[in-house]
Structures are given as C-alpha cells and as structure tokens.
C-alpha cells in the first residue's frame, strides 16, 4: 500500500477491505511439532504474506501467549504447545474458525 492508497483495490486505506477478504479466504493449518530434547513448537501455516503482515501477526501472538517465536517463509513458529489458544486468537483477529484446522 502506497501513500494511503491500497495497491490492490485502489481505495484509501480507511475504506480498504482487502485484508478482511483475505482473512476469510485463507485455509490455515495449526499443528504442534516436537523438536530436539522434547521441545514443542506450534506452527501456523497457510497464511498468505502478500495479503497479511506476518511480522505483525507474529508479534501480536507472541505478546498474548508470552512466548518466543519467529516467521519462517510463509509460516509462524511459536515456542511451546499453544494450538488451542492460537485458534482463539486467530478468531479474535477476524479469521473464520471453519477455515482453521
């Protein structure tokens, strides 16, 4: 988005709903992987980085869950098993629960 105008729809940022539409269309997969020494990592996949700022979403989740994490490629990795709480947080951010598995 450049200078207050959305590059996708051409509307001002205040009226743009591109991000809301993108949230409704995405199929998100939340899973827990085991790493070395029995550590668990919650991985959130299926997010489109062109429509949504993954860094901001990651920062929001890390602060709400009080954990560390990172953005790797098109996924967010959070330290620990936070699967249920991540689904609740995504729902509060406007993602449809039916599209989260």
UniProtKB/Swiss-Prot annotation:
Cross-referenced PANTHER family: DENSITY-REGULATED PROTEIN (PTHR12789:SF0), DENSITY-REGULATED PROTEIN HOMOLOG (PTHR12789)
Cell membrane among keywords: no
PROSITE patterns documented for this protein: SUI1 (PS50296)
Keywords attached to this entry: Protein biosynthesis, Translation regulation
Family that this chain belongs to: Belongs to the SUI1 family.
Gene3D superfamilies on file: SUI1-like domain (3.30.780.10)
GO MF term set: mRNA binding; translation initiation factor activity
NCBIfam families tied to this protein: PRK00939.1, SUI1_rel
The protein, known as: Protein translation factor SUI1 homolog
Residue spans crossing the bilayer: none
One GO process term, biological-process aspect: formation of translation preinitiation complex
The organism of origin for this protein: Methanospirillum hungatei JF-1 (strain ATCC 27890 / DSM 864 / NBRC 100397 / JF-1)
SUPFAM superfamilies the record matches: eIF1-like
